[in-house]
Amino acid sequence: METPAVSLLVAVYNTETYIRTCLESLRNQTMDNIEIIIVNDGSADASPDIAEEYAKMDNRFKVIHQENQGLGAVRNKGIEAARGEFIAFIDSDDWIEPDYCEQMLRTAGDETDLVICNYAAEFEDTGKTMDSDIAQTYQDQPKEHYIKALFEGKVRGFSWNKLYRRSMIEAHRLSFPLRGELEHVEDQFFSFRAHFFARSVSYVKTPLYHYRIHLSSIVQRYQKKLFESGLALYETNAAFLQENNKLEEYRKELDTFIVLHSSICMLNEWKTSGSRRLFEKLRNVGVICADPVFQESLSKTGTAPFDAKRSCLLLMAKYRMIPFVAMASAVYQRVIEYKMRNRG
């Protein structure tokens, strides 16, 4: 049996409205030597039936069903099943250009372990599209520049819009954290390590990946234990860098990461979804402000790396002015929600 050039790994969970668009974009790739592995994470809608429908009409599709275990377990299952020289992760509510595999593979050549393409953010609520400029910004920079930008929040740690050489993943035993370990930050955990171990990184300027954004969900959905997850990611990344004798090289960016993440978590408490009472929100904000890792990192970074609004918020957090931090966070979050609703 011929080894596929690319394994496209599709994570599926209750996306019956969008999955056909996704799977059609995979089926219509300009190159045939690919495999498409769909991992259904216990969906309760028609997504599994649609996936099986495609497997019957095209033998490049393979469907794996499992009980709901979370995104990390889904992607790990796909990695285990993959046979391709390269691996790409696709979310089932997104889609890719017909020449995605062809362009990414051509760019990879024989030496590149990681290829990153620009993506088009498709705003579901407004119908607007916004293209990223990752390739233009980082293609002439050493990979360390990208890693530092990842820690500083200048780029997102998405695992999609990338092509990974499977031998690199296997050689370094790369995998995603499981549910309960690093919730909400699985992609950044994996993306950082892939960049760290890649012999070289290449970029494609064309936006080959279409990322569907549901503003009402992303902007307003409360993420439980978000602060704890970020703190755990900070600590595990610091330990990883220490083991590889690189901690001092990235210390400043790591501190920036946890300070930025903490401020995001302050805003998270004031998202409109969820049933938290005012006392609970104030308590959670207080826990963030009092955290010793946050306070120590803030004392090192100061407020210089951040814009004026975030700097003001962090200055109040530094002195644990909890009522003012809460009020500023609530206003800041409402402004973000308003701007996102009226974007474009």
Swiss-Prot record:
Q: Known Gene3D superfamilies for this protein?
A: Spore Coat Polysaccharide Biosynthesis Protein SpsA, Chain A
Which EC class is the enzyme in? transferase
The record's Pfam families line, in alphabetical order, gives:
Glycos_transf_2
Recorded superkingdom: Bacteria
Gene Ontology terms, MF aspect? glycosyltransferase activity
The Gene Ontology biological process terms listed for this entry are: polysaccharide biosynthetic process
Tell me, using the record's free text, what induces this protein. Repressed by SinR.
Q: What is its EC number?
A: 2.4.-.-
Keywords, A to Z, come to: Exopolysaccharide synthesis, Glycosyltransferase, Transferase
- What task does this protein carry out? May be involved in the production of the exopolysaccharide (EPS) component of the extracellular matrix during biofilm formation. EPS is responsible for the adhesion of chains of cells into bundles. Required for biofilm maintenance.
State the family it belongs to. Belongs to the glycosyltransferase 2 family.
- Give the protein's recorded name: Putative glycosyltransferase EpsH
Biological source species: Bacillus subtilis (strain 168)
Per the record, the gene is epsH
